[in-house]
Amino acid sequence: MTIVNVIAIDGPTASGKGTVAHKVADAVGFHLLDSGALYRLVALASDRAGIDLADVDALAKIASRLDVKFGPDRVWLQGEEVSLAIRAEAIGNRASAIAVHQPVRDALTQLQRSFRKLPGLVADGRDMGTVIFPDAPLKVFLTASVEARARRRYKQLIDKGISANIEDLLRDLEARDVRDRTRTAAPLRPAEDAKLLDTSDMTVDQAVAQVLEWFAAVRPDA
């Protein structure tokens, strides 16, 4: 049977998992899945359609019909590039609120699993190792202090020309952490066999090197 390796990288908002996942995928030549972008796309599409966050059926319908295309550092929704639009803090907060609904998560499950193709996949999100790819040979739970994450998110937004307030970001991250960890549908938590990686005082390259070292030790097709 053909082995399609998956490196699952989970963690809270602004923990650095997206950047680490991107660099790991480049290093090993695997495809990349940014699962958080899918929830942000549902958030953007539903916001544009004027759908209330409490209308779970309508949100799930949008998720099941998501017309999305990914490219290097770019994403398209129904043919429109929305790479910057989905990174707005308001859309991120809306995505976090949408992600608590099981019907939405169910609608996106098969779409996420369809990204598993040769030569392999690096998947980053919040439930990659616990729900979407529980058989991944390497599961990493990447985290950092909320203060470090707020500073990173602030820099990301400013670098993209998006105005931000670090105190507001800190409050938003704390609220999102509570929501992600306490939701009934796939709460944010490490898989039982996940490697824990605290990046509060690490550079991106150090975190990437650690993930690559772990993968080299467990890679079944090596």
UniProtKB/Swiss-Prot annotation:
Top-level lineage group: Bacteria
Residues noted as binding ATP in the record, renumbered to the chain: 11-19
Keyword tags: ATP-binding, Cytoplasm, Kinase, Nucleotide-binding, Transferase
GO CC term, one of those recorded: cytosol
NCBIfam families documented for this protein: cmk
Similarity comment: family membership: Belongs to the cytidylate kinase family. Type 1 subfamily.
Protein's name in the database: Cytidylate kinase
Source organism of this protein record: Cupriavidus necator (strain ATCC 17699 / DSM 428 / KCTC 22496 / NCIMB 10442 / H16 / Stanier 337) (Ralstonia eutropha)
